[in-house]
Amino acid sequence: MTGNTFGNAFRITTFGESHGPGLGVVIDGCPAGLPLTEADVQAELDKRKPGQSEVTTQRKEADMVEILSGVFEGLTTGTPIAMLVRNADARSAAYENIRNIARPGHADFGYMEKYGMRDYRGGGRSSGRETLSRVAGGAVAKKLLSLYGVEVHAHTVAIGNVRAKPATIEEIKANVWKNPVRCADLSAADAMLREVSAAREASDSVGGIVEIVATGVPAGVGTPAFDKLDACLAYALMGIGGVKAVEIGAGIASAGMRGSEMNDEFCTEDGKVRTKTNRCGGILGGISTGMPIVCRAAIKPTPSISRPQRTVNLETGAETIIEITGRHDPSIVPRAVPVAEAMVALVIVDQMISGGLINPVSAGAVDASRNR
């Protein structure tokens, strides 16, 4: 199986399955001298771990991380950083009766067509549990970016038909982790919670939208043509399971605008070139403008629902009916928030190292003033 490595100058390779012994990540390209502890990574993993509220799966996992290599006396060494999280609460018996059944909306059929076999327990490699490895890698990326004044924050802006009002970065920081749906608009959060509860009570699920905002990214990050910053962000976010669309800045709404509405006029602010508005989402021509980078990921409803659905037995070819049991998220949107943060952080740190804005050898050699 290929496609398990992400990035160029700062690379992560994830491994593990939902019901295997554990999952983890190997990071290559992190500079030496970055202060890093298991607590740094654990803080990020705790944001996505299951069983924290009624809107997530009730699978109980502590998701305790172990750093196996690449860190000595609290500092990265410049060698590969390996991290492992062991599974503790897998219940594979719930999948035994559907081991040969293609679950609608899942990767089962595609895996069988490509590989001729699959780990049917909890989706195996295609499970959303794989994203904990991305969050662990993103934790290191975020720690490195923080030395350069770059922060990445995400929040839920829609669940089902409930939309949040626009939020400032201060509101996002202050409110997102105060509610189980990870919404910065606390009044909308209550309505979103009701939307998720209604879907669960109807043996159904619901999707939504996560918005990610990166601040402090200097102008000049990204390259023209195929490795445009926005192209890389879209690629990274589309790689998250369940994401079906990505927007940058005004996104799809820009198709209905005139140029006079869409264009962000330039101005100077504290001696630096800025734009009066930010409909471009902080990126023009594939290169950052110095304004906040804003992107959104649309996430489909969780495909695991307990309603009867038509499907096919992949062993016999016979049509059949499936009713999925087990522990599943009625909405994966809230737990996608830290995953989206991680993927955006990984893109930005990779591009900043590639572009010479972060020292690729030593994190101690930081001249952060050049990037602010």
From Swiss-Prot:
Instruction: Tell me the keywords, alphabetical order.
Output: Amino-acid biosynthesis, Aromatic amino acid biosynthesis, FAD, Flavoprotein, FMN, Lyase, NADP
One GO BP annotation of this record? amino acid biosynthetic process
Family annotation (CDD domains): Chorismate_synthase
Task: Give an example GO molecular function.
Answer: chorismate synthase activity
Q: Which GO terms describe its cellular component?
A: cytosol
What is the role of the protein in this entry?
This reaction introduces a second double bond into the aromatic ring system.
Name under which the protein is recorded:
Chorismate synthase
